[in-house]
Amino acid sequence: MYGLTTKNITNANGIQILKGEKVQCLFITELGNNCYEGLFVTETGIKFLSDFSNIKFILKEND
């Protein structure tokens, strides 16, 4: 799944991912109570964890 960040996010190493960056979801973890967290990676290879409220997903049909 691909998406865009909806706000600035700082990863565990202190690297900031800016609002509007294109990201890919690599892995999804269920946290319980209908909450989920994903492992995302930016186009430049920066990995970060985030809940799905910080990502707007891009959905498109196959051509």
Model segments located where?
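SH3-family beta-barrel domains
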Residues: 1-9, 29-30
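Secondary-structure transition/turn motif
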Residues: 7, 21, 41-45
